[in-house]
Amino acid sequence: MIICDFHNHTCFSADSDSTPESMIEKAIDLGLSYLCMTDHMDLDFPYTELDFTFDVSEYFKKHDELRQIYGDRIQLLTGIELGLQPGVYADLKDLLSKWDFDFVIGSSHLVDRVDPYFPIYWQDKTESAGILRYFETILENVADFDDIDVYGHIDYIVRYAPSKAAHYSYQKYQEILDEIIKTLISKNIGLELNTAGFKYGLGFPNPHMDILKRYRELGGEIITIGSDGHVPEHLAYDFKKVPEILKACGFDHYTIFQKRKAEFIKL
């Protein structure tokens, strides 16, 4: 059994209405030992109707209060999911220097200031070109900002591609994906296994198992597990599949973080 969820969102994120209490109580019901909440911090997000930032002081205050209430039943950790894009790296570095997070995810939610969630992203390009450009931006991000513990859902874009995963494979983008993986390993940045891919009907987690396997083949060890749940019902989503996926990809462990330090848990 996987005993932790290290990617989930509460009402501190613009796309969730779930209270932290509801997520914690669900995690306890599921028998989890650790819950690391990772709310969105997407600075300079171009879609102004949604504010993907939050008051970090209030976030830490709330988490401290919740540890007093629930700390004897589950270990609560304070994480954050940073939306990476050019122009925000200095502000993110400043943020992380001021706050003592347990865990930091870096993610790509924008490609050249457009969210591939929206159909307009795909209107002026082929599907293959749109996916390739997304991977290029990951390399650009980690070249300039590497103060993260894992890179989140590195093939996130496939969730929203016009054909979803029908024409997608690791092999099709192997050259750039290998470059991403090698770069992450060289910077001691891990990957996450994000089970939301199953929720979106892809039939695999994000990233695809072939990417996880290649990461392991190239020496990668840091692998966290997250549901990307935005409601309690999606917490630990399809985690029952995770142990066999990890083993098939060459892992005998998964990873948690406390105070930005990796700890390995045997399968």
Where are these regions (language model features)?
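Charged catalytic cores and adjacent phosphate/nucleic-acid-binding surfaces used
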Residues: 1-6, 10, 16, 20, ...
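An N-terminally biased module of ancient metal coordination in phosphate/nucleic-acid-related enzymes
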Residues: 1-86, 95-98, 160-162, 167-171, ...
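Structural preference for beta-strand elements that scaffold enzyme active sites
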Residues: 2-5, 34-36, 75-79, 102-105, ...
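Phenylalanine-focused residue identity feature
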Residues: 6, 12, 45, 52-54, ...
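Conserved residues at the C-terminal ends of beta-strands
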Residues: 38, 107, 154, 194, ...
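Extended substrate/RNA-proximal surfaces in nucleic-acid metabolism proteins
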Residues: 49, 53-186
